Amino acid sequence: MTARSRLCPLLAASVGALLLCAAEAPATAAPHSYTIVIDKLKFGPVPAQLHKGDTIMWVNKDLFRHSATAADHSFDVDLMPGKAGKTVLTKSGSIPFVCRYHPNMRGLLQVK
């Protein structure tokens, strides 16, 4: 048996092991940024595909001061008229949020 014939099975096994490891590694998506506009005493549409690590930019286009405040206190962004602020989503799950100044303004983030 030549050295080459002994190396072929070893090389094939190594490549197979690498492919198996790559197939089992979880895919992690790069974080995304989304914008939620506040206007006319309402939060704009909430993005549907939120993931842990994503950023939400809150933009207040209203004439009034607003906040985006999570019920679980995981974020609290205070926004003067015409200003913006951001939140990085640090956990998964359903996160209800409200405006502290206008409690009828509510929303729900679904974070995977």
Feature roles, as predicted:
Residues 2-11, 18-112:
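Extracytoplasmic copper-binding redox domains, predominantly the cupredoxin/blue-copper superfamily
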